[in-house]
Amino acid sequence: TFPVGEVDGATKKLLQVTEESLYLALEAAVVGNHVGDIGAAVMARVDGTGYGIIRDLVGHGLGRELHEEPQVPNVGKAGQGPPLLEGMVLAIEPMLGASTDQIRTLDDRWTVISADRGRSAHFEHTMAVTSEGPRVLTGPVPAGYNLLGSPVLNPETG
């Protein structure tokens, strides 16, 4: 999600929390954890903010197809769900609504909005589960997180 023009403090906070939940979820994607650990990381960051975690759309595995198993919900319980195995490639994509967790698809059958037409945010990275730790494949890795970067995009952390 990118803000267009000047945005107010409430929108900036929604964007910040959504992006932080992405990086915390990525950190949870380690060998030996489970898919539920990823959703639990999102929930832990969002808890107490008043934001709704969109549950009807999920992250997913990637491989021969764009959308593969496992589904990676943005809610979960630590230690639950399919195990995370070395070599898995996942799209992790937290989505939050400022005032609801409900969504609606418009008549074009593509555009998704929050059910109350309020603000929402979505951040996503594709990552690999490796024995060295979570490796972000699709963009730079911000400082302060225990993540590996792509050797191409982040030569210093790759």
Segment roles from a protein language model:
Residues T1-G158:
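Active-site neighborhoods and metal-handling regions in enzymes and metal-associated proteins
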